[in-house]
């Protein structure tokens, strides 16, 4: 049992020769995989260079996964959404206020088509090894996610499309209070868009590998995120996903939290014959003592995690979300990557 993949995310796609230099630096940091964060703008504007960048990564020996970063604000990420800019409709709607929100409703045919076209076009053109589904989520609630916060009351989505589907399926108007039917409806619809697109990608090329990365929450009696992907069994059981991954945990959260999330991630993945993946926070914040990075990697390793991921290249250096000592953080993560990836060979 050992860690077989070490990934880092990479954005600001543009010039192949610049990406190539960055890929060399990733190799020097023990990375086996680059997760290309392809924004809606990149897709719209830089598309000719995306396959060339993938080719450069392959030439250097990196595996490449494509992350439709922040698409429609359905996935996690800071990027702005062209879909939201170009469409005033097809947005998630607050159950309590009826307001349309700056999040695409991924249950609408319009956004589903947009998402599928984005991914299938890249599956055909880019020549990458697979896709990374990055923190898919409903806009609300998330207050449930906090281990200190209380339960949120508002939720999404009560747009005309969701309300119509709900009525058709359950035979009554979608309530404003989140009952069990609403919970099931939200989860079922949320899974559909990812499964449908994954299936179509694999039909195009069966070798394409899909990682589904959901929020790392306790999902306990007291704390449930209700973002649509809380039932890890449902997600990990999907035949269209190859890797079950759970997101970054902030360095200052208790050790026990890291341990519980990791145990449950590995257990869910193994139960359904999937690879497991856990993440390191390589931007924004850093541990007070960098040795905590070593200890966390050791914990992941000891609990049987198959793959490690880090967000993001160079600790976010140069961005508003850079870690205070971004380059040192990146180096320490790199040292850990090099240590673990040498094992089991
Ligand atoms: Zn909706």
Question: Where in this protein do the model-derived segments appear?
Answer:
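Aromatic-lined carbohydrate-recognition surfaces of secreted/lumenal glycan-active proteins
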Residues: 7-11, 65-69, 132-136, 181-228, ...
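Substrate-binding cleft/loops of secretory-pathway carbohydrate-active enzymes
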Residues: 141, 194-258, 285-299
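Substrate-binding cleft of secreted/luminal carbohydrate-active enzymes
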Residues: 246-254, 277-344
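Catalytic domains of carbohydrate-active enzymes, especially glycoside hydrolases
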Residues: 16-43, 125-128, 237-244, 299-308
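Short, acidic/polar
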Residues: 11-27, 111-122, 223-238, 289-299
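Active-site-adjacent "subsite" loops/lids of carbohydrate-active enzymes
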Residues: 66-126, 166-180, 195, 291-293
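Aromatic-lined substrate-binding rim segments of carbohydrate-active enzymes
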Residues: 22-23, 35-86, 185-204
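The substrate-binding groove and active-site-proximal loops of carbohydrate-active enzymes
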Residues: 7-14, 35-44, 97-116, 175-191, ...
